[in-house]
Amino acid sequence: MKTNHPETYDGRQDHIPSLKTPEIESFTNVYEGKDYTIDFTVPEFTAVCPKTGLPDFGVIYVSYVPTKRCIELKSFKEYILSYRNVGVFHEFLVNKIMEDLIAAIDPKYLKVIGDYNARGGIKTVVTREYNKI
């Protein structure tokens, strides 16, 4: 039994790392040097399945400990909305969000979770954590 299908999936996500999205803006952390956590949730995230073209729905959770900069939420909302019509696998999306947030604010700690609605009887949760060395 063949378990992978490179002819079906290879190359479908090559554009994701360089995908042009709105800038995630930031502001100065006036409590730099104090460790505190900022958590926020995107309860109505939508993108498109690159395989089927059907919409994917889920919740995106972000938790971070800032250093010098904090995420400006209106710009993050615009960033998240830019994925609405993008065909992206769950795993690629969580990693792309993680890398874009690291580039924007260089946090001490960051966790991104993509908790997707069940499709075809399968629920997907993708988690990535980052700790600054």
UniProtKB/Swiss-Prot annotation:
Reactions accelerated catalytically: 7-aminomethyl-7-carbaguanine + 2 NADP(+) = 7-cyano-7-deazaguanine + 2 NADPH + 3 H(+)
EC annotation from Swiss-Prot or TrEMBL: 1.7.1.13
Domain of life where this protein originates: Bacteria
Catalytic machinery residues: C49 (thioimide intermediate), D56 (proton donor)
Positions with a binding annotation for substrate: I71, E72, L73, H90, E91
UniProt GO MF annotations: preQ1 synthase activity
Record family assignment: Belongs to the GTP cyclohydrolase I family. QueF type 1 subfamily.
Protein name, per record: NADPH-dependent 7-cyano-7-deazaguanine reductase
Species per Swiss-Prot/TrEMBL record: Leptospira borgpetersenii serovar Hardjo-bovis (strain JB197)
